[in-house]
Regions:
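Conserved beta-strand-loop surface patch within small alpha/beta domains used
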Residues: 1-88, 97-153
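Residue-level "edge-of-site" marker
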Residues: 94
């Protein structure tokens, strides 16, 4: 499925999850069976604090300022998507009391060395202030860089 800025019309499940995770970053993925198939939201736990506790040098932040998928959850999600003939279309996460911008760390994680790890996947960032979603932007890789646009909430 070619990467695009497509999103489901109804983001309420995504927004509820991200608001419920406040004051930590929430995260998850949007899956889709082909470019015209139905969307499915899969909320995932933010495992960052567990990794920070085990290795604060390698994981210097907290779940308030960073997110990390649990590798076993990510593997299970990919197997589940394959079994359902779905593709991961979008990774979403929140920024807490800030702005809905794909940060330098987000960009580095998504495209280390300028090469996207998931070239067919877009990234939705939602700013959650005091437990309420306020702003969202979607990012996708095209022609060697991230493109973006605002997303109405």
């Amino acid at each position: 499925m070619p990467v695009s800025d497509a999103l489901p019309e109804d983001l309420s499940e995504v927004l509820r999850h991200l608001e419920a995770c406040y004051p930590q970053e929430g995260c998850g993925v949007l899956l889709r069976a082909g470019p015209w198939g139905p969307w499915r939201v899969r909320c995932l736990p933010n495992a960052y604090d567990r990794y920070h506790a085990a290795d604060p040098r390698r994981f210097p932040h907290s779940a308030r300022t960073a997110f990390l998928f649990e590798p076993r959850e990510w593997l299970a999600l990919n197997r589940e998507a394959d079994a359902r003939n779905e593709q991961i279309a979008c990774v979403f996460h929140s920024h807490i009391d800030g702005v809905a911008v794909l940060s330098a760390e987000d960009r580095q994680a998504a495209a280390p060395g300028g090469i996207p790890l998931l070239p067919e996947v877009s990234y939705l960032v939602v700013n959650v202030e005091r437990g309420q979603a306020h702003e969202a932007r979607i990012y996708w890789w095209r022609e060697g860089e991230f493109q973006d646009r605002g997303v109405p909430l």
